[in-house]
Amino acid sequence: MKQIKLSGRELAVLRAIDYATGSTGTEIQEKTSIDGADVAEILNALCEIGYAEVYPLVDPVTAANYAGSRFEINPSYALQLKEAMRRR
């Protein structure tokens, strides 16, 4: 299995997502203190890779539509992502 490598900003966003219930874009932005447009860009990349999922489905995730969307960790990658976060 391939080892997941994440940037510091990707790690911050993934750590801000609640594993049990998910988090809205606004909650993620508040927890990370990253600019909204940058959070939207990071979330879009994580969704494209498959590490995160967005509800309701919007493609692409943009600064205009991320705030009210709910983001969850993809259960298929949950263990690998937790391991990647522990390494840093």
Indicate where each model-derived feature is located.
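Short amphipathic alpha-helical interaction segments
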Residues: S33-I49, E53-Y55, G68
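Short alpha-helical segments that sit at the start of domains
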Residues: M1-V13
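Intrinsically disordered, low-complexity Ser/Thr- and acidic-rich flexible linkers and loops
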Residues: D59-N65
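Short acidic, hydrophobic short linear motifs in intrinsically disordered regions
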Residues: G22-K31
